[in-house]
Structure formats: C-alpha cells, structure tokens
C-alpha cells in the first residue's frame, strides 16, 4: 500500500484524502494543530509544524512515505519540495519552488527573463523600505513575500500610508521579508484558478473571473469566482504561452498549480502568482464539476509516481460560479436562508460549515469563510450578476455582537 503525506489540516485537504483512499492509498496528515478537521479523515496524524523542513524530513523517513503534497496549504509548499527532493520523490525542484514561493525572488525572476512584471523590490528592513518610497509610482501593493490568503496585504495610495502598511506586512511575514510593488490596475476581472502540467507540458489551463467584496473588512480577500474568464481570447492565449514558458524554464514537470493572472489597463498580460499547489476555496473541486476533469486525483497520482489521466484545456458548456459565503458582521450563527427559486435554478452544490451557535467573524481572510455555493448559469453575464449581488439570494442569520 502506497503512503502519502499531506501537509496541513484544513477542510481543503478532505477531497485529497477521499481521492487517495479511492486509490487504496494510506494517508498521513501533518501539522501542529491536532484538532484540525482533516485529521479526522486521514489514517494517521503527525504533530509537526509544516514550516520545519528538517522535522518533516525526519518524520517522512520514519513514516516511509511514497509521496508528499501540500494541497491548498501555502506554508507547506517549500517544505514539500525540500522533503521530496531529499527523498527522491516525485515533485517540483526545490530551487524552482523557492523562487515561486517568495514574491521578491519571483518578481526578480520574471524581470530577468523578460516577462511582463510590475516594478517591485524586496526588503528585510523597515527603514530601507521606507527610504525607497520615491522609487515607486503610487499606488503600490505592500505584502509579505511568504504569506498567502491576503494576509498582511495593503494597497497604498501615497507615502503617508506607507509606514503602517510596511509594519502590517512585516508582522504577517514568517521570514520577516516584504515586497513593495507598483499596483497593476486591471482591465476586466483578474483570474485566480488552477492549472495542470504533465512532463513540463501545460495540458490544462483555466482562466476565470475573480470577485471581491468592497464592503468586507479586508477587500482583498476573494469572495467569488466565475468561469470562463472575461479576458479577451488573445490575452488568454498569450498568458497560456507565458505560463507554459515558465513551467519549462523552471522544469516543474508534472504538477497542479494555482495561478493568478490579469490584463493590465496597459493592455499587457501579467502572471501575478504561480504556486505549485492547488488553490484554496475549492477551485479544483469546482473545475471537476464544471469540466469533468479531476485535477485532485491526478495531482495525487503524480505525487505517487503513478500514470496520470489524459487532460485537456477545459470546455465549460455554459458558465459556472463559486460564491464564498462570508459575513461582514460578527456574531453567533443562526443559519442561512437561500432563495428557493434561485436554489432550484442555479445551485449545483451548497456546503455550509457551521452549526447553530457557532462563532461568526467578519471576513478578514479566507479562513473566515463559512461555506461555499457552486452554481451553473447560461452565460458569463448571468453568473457575474449573481455573485456580485448575492445578498438578493442569500441571507446569513446572526445574533450580532453588541
């Protein structure tokens, strides 16, 4: 029986555990929080911090694993590549993953290799970051180089706002490194979705529309998605070509990726992020429902050195959307009301994560979501209208904090 080590413990790991079990694989989950929900589904739990590369390597040797993954769990991606390379397991090269997972190194790589990239610079020192303020054209984005889920990210309109943003980013950074980059204003919607390569060939390239809630405490946390993308076909083709080039240059092999892209108002396509892991917010699960292609199962097969299925660029047959259920008020959860007609016509899957009486916090990050809706529509415009006006169809019942 093959043995698979999954780094992390949140609910996004559960589909991986279930898929691995379908293959007859023994699954071990690993993090330092034994009460995390994924550990209830795995065959074994290992209590180690996933950012401690040497400790995870030692455990992996003792556990005699055949594969390692860090699905939808950004802090574990570098550890996953490190352990995999040390043990000779399938996976992306550690050196390449180190570039992809550190925003300052990634921006430098893109610049050095002729990709479209915003003007950016990395810092490990508050004074130096502030001193360089005049190097940039505002607005800028200030963020940690090593965090995901919009933690520590601030859009800054002028120098006066920069001090607080720099402090905020340093506080959220594990390695105490931040990056300041010029903000790329987008034309249409940005894209945040999953892709797949086999033997350095990009075989499944998806693009979508990413939506945000301007009323949320943190307006940079994705609140919804729809497929297909509203980016022009020629921009999608150029982005696909550039993603393919990046995969080959970094020799990433066979892997699932979360990829963030956009078209700037300057008309140029930009790769904003490419991480060799699945995205959060159940993106690969939605893509399976929408396209019939199972990226999660194939990522597991790849991690274990098993042959993957034949994958092709997606055909959506209409429009699909995912809404991240969240609250902009804090309180005690009393339930969710969904418009019956809307549910009948559009809801393919609903997943509520709370019980009556549970705590609800404001939407400061992806970890404050309280469920998801997966929906089907006839057109992109219909999907976009729905996810941007979800208050018409969905009500969260709360006993609000006083």
Segments the model singles out, each with a brief description of its role:
Residues 169-177, 184-228, 237-271, 275-283, ...:
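Phosphate-binding core of ATP-grasp and ATP-grasp-like enzymes
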Residues 99-179, 199, 229-241, 245, ...:
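Active-site nucleotide/adenylate-binding loops and adjacent lid/helix of ATP-dependent enzymes
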Residues 257, 342-358:
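A structural supersecondary motif
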Residues 277-298:
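ATP-dependent carboxylate-activation loops
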Residues 154, 182, 227-228, 288, ...:
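Short, well-ordered beta-strand elements within core beta-sheets of diverse protein domains
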Residues 55, 129, 162-164, 330-336, ...:
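Short, conserved charged micro-motifs
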